[in-house]
Amino acid sequence: MKTYQQLTDHLKTIEKHEIHDSASQSYITFVHEFMDSLNEFCSKHQNAFDGQFYNILLENNISWDIKDMSNTDVTSLDEKVILALILGATKDVSFYEGALLPYIENRSLERWLRRLEYFDSFSATN
């Protein structure tokens, strides 16, 4: 399995465009499955990410808010920053399942996962 495949496998669900209502069962299922994958990934890859998402965002001049995180150009960001964006977006999910919806609707989560997919494809060729 590629490093980020556990997370990027969720792109298939995002692409179906069936998860754009926070009250729908498909959205709720997606959030639970994605969060399970993210938590498992973080516990398996502690060396790839030190868990300090907020500091990583600040170091890269990214505010922890929907607008700034969503408008961030990811083309030059490394894996650590992409993971910090994802963790920042999911931080409030335990309090409010709908917290991830804006990042799905504006396609930020998809862009971030595609960037991780790029890193997996790049590492596979080297």
Sequence positions of predicted segments:
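Amphipathic alpha-helical binding modules
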Residues: 84-126
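Short terminal alpha-helical segments
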Residues: 1-54, 111
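Short amphipathic alpha-helical heptad-repeat segments
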Residues: 3-7, 72-92
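N-terminal acidic leader/helix
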Residues: 59-77
